[in-house]
Amino acid sequence: MARHAGRGWYGRVIGAAIGVTAVAAGASVWTAQAGQNTPAAPAHHTTPKTVAVSPVIAHSSDGGAHAVNITIDDGPDPTWTPQVLQVLRENGVKATFCMIGPEAQAHPDVVKQVVAAGHRLCDHTVSHDTAMDHKSESYQSQQILDAERQITEASGGVRPMYYRAPGGAFTPYSRKLAASHGMRPLGWNVDSKDFERPGTDAIVATVRSELANGPTLLFHDAGGDRSQTVAALRTLMPWLKQQGYGFGFPVR
């Protein structure tokens, strides 16, 4: 997620919100031109060993220039994640869920629902510390690798395919570490601003107005009441299809 104040259950988060960290470095140029829907990419699979991926922050979609990536941060949440899953199912859309390690550990049944529905997992650290780019390498390693283990255990053995730094607080070290564990660093192009709960119409308007920034859209399924997010997704996904966009996963 982007850096935010007023985190609700984030009282245990280490570090204060200190402003949005830009993640545009390494982003591909986004083509706003619409096209046909593309077939859903293969979802997770459990592998016996880690295959290293690129440490460059991913922004583009494996669905091509006419596809968007739906990414959902900060869960899983036993109330809101199933509702997000239902909306995705109704629209035939796959998404990437960036999970907090202890939340995954606390709700393994929800993690398994995400995997069973064909969505992908993403490591969003243990404590959601948006200042972790100012912390030691050993601290960064603990945050990333402990969460990877917790998410993998909760999923029944399915590993996260991406790593999203809280608030975009990437470092060269954290990107290389995640990539060496098979997790592509994942940025975003459009922050829906749903975390502040500005109202469903405002969330929809933000995504529509900023869609030209790039294909990876950021939403949240935890950290408070996410009914506005659920409603916004219910409006946005049919609208995106009407505009000719397809849906994909972030590139690996």
What are these regions (language model features)?
Residues M1-I70, D77-E90, K112, T235-R252:
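N-terminal pre-catalytic segment of deacetylase/amide-hydrolase enzymes
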Residues L85-T96, R120, E137-G168, K176, ...:
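CE4/NodB-like, metal-dependent polysaccharide N-deacetylase domain
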Residues G75-P82, Q105, S138-S141, G168, ...:
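Soluble non-cytosolic domains of exported or imported proteins
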Residues A169-E210, G244-R252:
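His/Asp/Glu-enriched short active-site or ligand-binding loop at hydrolase and phosphoryl-transfer sites
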Residues G101-A104, S127-T130, P166-A169, D191-D194, ...:
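Short histidine/acidic/glycine/proline-rich micro-motifs that form metal-
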Residues Q83-V84, D109-V110, Y173-L177, A232:
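A short acidic, amphipathic alpha-helical/loop segment
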Residues H44-K135, Q143-D146, Q150, P160:
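Active-site beta->alpha N-cap acidic-glycine motif
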